[in-house]
Amino acid sequence: MNAAGSPSVLLVGPYDPHCGEYTFLAPPLGVWRLAGVLEAAGVRTKVFDPNCCSELPQRALEREILNGTWDVVGISTTGMTLRFDLELAHLARRIAPSALIVAGGMEATFRPDLMFELGPFDLVVLGEGERPLLDLATRLRAGQGVEGISGTARRTADGRVVSLSQRALNRQELRDAIFSIPYEQMPYAAYWERLETAYRVGALPSKAAREAQLAEIRSVRLITLNYCPMGCTFCSATNFLHEAQGSVASIARLDADECLQMIERIVAAQPRIRTVIFQDDIFSYTRDHRILPLCEGIATAKRDGRIPAHLQFISTNRIDAMSVERLTAMRRAGFRVLGFGIENFSQQVLGEFNKAQIYRHIEPMLSAALSLGMTPFLDLILSSPRASLEDVAVTLREAHRWLLRGCEIGMYPYVIPFSGAALAKDPSLAPHVQYVEREIAGTGISWSQPAKILPIDPVVADVVLRIERSFELMLGSLESDVAHLPSRLRSLLWILCSLRIMAEHGHYIASESEVRAQLYARLPALRSEATGLVAALV
């Protein structure tokens, strides 16, 4: 406790030592939102991001903990970063044995039992952290115990895990939490500098290329929605608030005027910004009354000088929620990249993902976005549990076609069994889940973590794994000798690595020489070295 009798809270973001593989290098927005809410309530709070340290993250965290007296250390967890998050949790426990160590985030919400089994946690927060942490701070001020806090799980003396549900934040509560985000305190400059170095911006051959890269790097993220309700079977985030509440949570999001207020706040707080990224899993709905007024409000704010005329925007959208009218309005407002969760170009696989309804919208809406000068960014999963080899071939061919037309693509080879996702819970798929043995550094604790849901067809599974092995070999060599490769280049690598393997099974995807030439042309630096590497590895 500080002199005023208020607890001190240290919030630690998810730790991705391979930053860019599981996360994007940016301030952990959910953690900063929690910090803003706690600070507004008079709770001294600090954010520690292990992905943006000037020294080893473990050493930096040790220094941070030793330099303060922390009553609570909160550890954020995700499925992909869990072993690293747990490493920091155990480190915090060793350095601050009297502090409450609290887990939160996606993985903690779906697997509180695993948190207590593997970690040194006193408490696990389920779902949104604002209300439970405020309640925890109130109890610590009053010298009360932590039992019975809604939205938490704890382990009893006899080893049972007792979970208490909580209602998701309503619209006003969500609005207040978002407006509490302390953008003025967030060290974006440090992140931008690291990204510019990683992407070797100074080595780009033209001013236009450098400016385009800076527009992508100097971005600030804004969340305006509590969750995506679409129920994709591979997704865990769609079930996050339902799990914490114990029932279906209501949707809540900012309205157009509130979005504009936040944009103006962000610009004032971070004047070097080039792009606002709306980090909502789904920015617009089919029946959406916000998108057109928001675009008009942005255009008006630019004309009035309230925000810079050059400010650009990126969002993730339902492709079946797009129309030429909406796309035109977004282009005029300054949207330059539109993310679309296409996931797969096979109608059969889309049905398996609970996305069959988007199939007929893909071709016309991608074409319309490109014709208006915007860049669609497509998220793809190369295979599904019930995919055929033809499904894989269709997605590879279409991915290559849309890359040539101007889209950018991020690609995964198979479904990852995220905790809480419908496919991860499907017992019929259990024989096709591959596990990876994970170890928590510095502890000797290990466990088997689900890592891949492979196609049921053994031929398809073998093909996908062979493509993955080839991709990993080539990616490792390229990134060690050239530069960090963004997803747009990784997608070309996936396609290149698939060509010979798919051809063995009678599926022509594209010309190898053409794909290789396209990769050479896009490599960010040291093209001669990269050319030799690719030729040697393919």
Place the predicted regions along the sequence by residue.
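Radical SAM enzyme core and accessory elements
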Residues: N2-L11, R44, E62-I65, D71-V72, ...
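Conserved N-terminal glycine/acidic-rich loop preference
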Residues: W70, I75-G79, R111, Y285-R287, ...
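Glycine/serine-rich loop-strand microenvironments at binding/catalytic pocket rims
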Residues: E62-T69, A212, I217, M230-G231, ...
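Conserved beta-strand positions
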Residues: I75, A103, L126, F278-D280, ...
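A structural motif corresponding to the C-terminal lobe/cap of the Radical SAM core domain
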Residues: G5-D16, T69-W70, L88, A252-A256, ...
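Radical SAM [4Fe-4S] cluster-binding motif and immediate context
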Residues: A26, Q185-T375, R397
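Glycine-/small-residue-rich active-site loops that bind phosphorylated ligands and cofactors
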Residues: C53, M80-T81, E107, F283-T286, ...
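Acidic, low-complexity intrinsically disordered segments
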Residues: N2-L260, R272
